[in-house]
Amino acid sequence: SECLVGSEMCIRDRAYVAGILHDVMKEEEPSVQRAYIEKAGERMSNLEIRIGKVYHQMSGAAYARLELGITDPDILHAIRYHTTARRGMSLLEQIIYLADFISADRHYKDVETMRAKVDEGLEPGMFYALTYTITDLARQGRPIHPDTVDAYNWVLERRG
């Protein structure tokens, strides 16, 4: 069945585009990534500068918009927040965040538990993923991006 309706892409098509592009800048040098972030008019906080792992999500969204002409805010947000998550994530954003977290190339300690939680649904998957991330970063004494904490609190609020 055709998924394109008018000029709007369905969630499956948008997930495909965001999934292909979410790591488009991951292998680029940090200086190249930061240049794209600046070119897109985004400002990095001091914390984001210290957390190099978030560069590729920010630069990836910038690249998708500036070089590929992608204007769909949901696709851009799915790329932009696939590492940190954020409060108020759309369905597409949650799908890309969790798909990245449980992809076949992931081999962290609790990956099988994480995959099982995602199989239960988005809400259990998001709760487990964010709890795991915050706990793991805290255990290592590493900084936790405020968007991740906000996402965790948002998921917690939605659980009731």
Language model feature labels by segment:
Residues 135-160:
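Charged phosphate-binding loop/patch that engages nucleotide di/tri-phosphates or the phosphate backbone
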Residues 1-6:
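Single conserved hydrophobic/aromatic residue that forms the stacking wall/gate
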Residues 7-8, 12-130:
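Divalent metal-dependent catalytic cores for phosphoryl transfer on phosphate-bearing substrates
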